[in-house]
Swiss-Prot record:
NCBIfam families: trpA
Record keyword tRNA processing present: no
Keywords linked to the UniProt accession: Amino-acid biosynthesis, Aromatic amino acid biosynthesis, Lyase, Tryptophan biosynthesis
Annotated CDD domains: Tryptophan_synthase_alpha
InterPro entries: Aldolase_TIM, RibuloseP-bd_barrel, Trp_synthase_alpha_AS, Trp_synthase_suA
Quaternary assembly: Tetramer of two alpha and two beta chains.
Domain of life: Bacteria
A single GO molecular function term of this UniProt record: tryptophan synthase activity
Catalytic activity: (1S,2R)-1-C-(indol-3-yl)glycerol 3-phosphate + L-serine = D-glyceraldehyde 3-phosphate + L-tryptophan + H2O
Cysteine-cysteine disulfides: none
Active site (record annotation): E49 (proton acceptor), D60 (proton acceptor)
Protein name listed in UniProt: Tryptophan synthase alpha chain
Species lineage: Bacteria, Pseudomonadati, Pseudomonadota, Gammaproteobacteria, Enterobacterales
Recorded name of the encoding gene: trpA
Role noted for this protein: The alpha subunit is responsible for the aldol cleavage of indoleglycerol phosphate to indole and glyceraldehyde 3-phosphate.
């Protein structure tokens, strides 16, 4: 959990925002997935947001659903995902690692056992996409018991009560939603979110990272100009994996070429 605080303090000192890529663990297979994560970090990723393949991803658009299907086709299980997380943590001791997932996966293990396992492999945060703030008590309590930051989504239409709850219960960072709907690079992020960012700051919320529809450096810059601490990009990255599925080396090169200007856009 402290890795986020350390990261945001360091970035603030350098007058930089965070660039955070999202990928699905095990897409398109375990070995290549680990290489992808190394490539993202080498190219400048400040933190990682990782999905565990799940059969019914509600908030995901077709791009990320396909990533899940590819991981399933490779026979990737949640147990293997945790093994991967352990390997990633060993190799990269300081980078914040966040999971973005669905409640069924947490229930399958048992809530407390799930967060205990996260702590054991070195996961810093968990966002359970289909659990609203008002139903989050058992999740966030287990998370905090195991030194894992509970992450909450702040939608563009959040009212004062919701903003207060998010600020009060969230740790690590706040997932600031560019817009309602499903994920996807086609649906470009619509700003301004300045008023939300200002309110979150007023209530001392964890630093906001803007996600959904972030696919170009100008959007990263716009998010940071609006006061966000950084930006999360998922579908645009997963699409690169999809497009170069039969050219593993080229895939890694194209991913790096995508991440470098996205990271550069975080520097004011």
């Amino acid at each position: 959990m402290e890795r986020y605080e350390t990261l945001f303090a360091r970035l603030k000192e350098r007058k930089e925002g965070a660039f955070v890529p999202f990928v699905t663990l095990g897409d398109p297979g375990i070995e290549q997935s680990l290489k992808i994560i190394d490539a993202l970090i080498e190219a400048g990723a400040d933190a990682l947001e990782l999905g565990i393949p799940f059969s019914d991803p509600l908030a995901d658009g077709p791009t990320i659903q396909n990533a899940t299907l590819r991981a399933f086709a490779a026979g990737v299980t949640p147990a293997q995902c945790f093994e991967m997380l352990g390997l990633i943590r060993q190799k990269h001791p300081n980078i914040p690692i966040g999971l973005l997932m669905y409640a069924n996966l947490v229930f399958n293990k048992g809530i407390d056992e799930f967060y205990a396992q996260c702590e054991k492999v070195g996961v810093d945060s968990v966002l359970v996409a289909d659990v609203p703030v008002e139903e989050s008590a058992p999740f966030r309590q287990a998370a905090l018991r195991h030194n894992v930051a509970p992450i909450f989504i702040c939608p563009p239409n959040a009212d004062e009560d919701l903003l207060r709850q998010i600020a009060s219960y969230g740790r690590g960072y706040t997932y600031l939603l560019s817009r309602a709907g499903v994920t996807g690079a086609e649906n470009r992020a619509a700003l301004p979110l300045n008023h939300l960012v200002a309110k979150l700051k007023e209530y001392n919320a964890a630093p906001p990272l803007q996600g959904f529809g972030i696919s170009a450096p100008d959007q990263v810059k716009a998010a940071i100009d609006a006061g966000a601490a950084g930006a999360i990009s998922g579908s645009a990255i997963v699409k690169i994996i999809e497009q170069h599925i039969n050219e593993p080396e080229k895939m890694l090169a194209v991913l790096k070429a995508f991440v470098q200007p996205m990271k550069a856009a975080t520097r004011s």
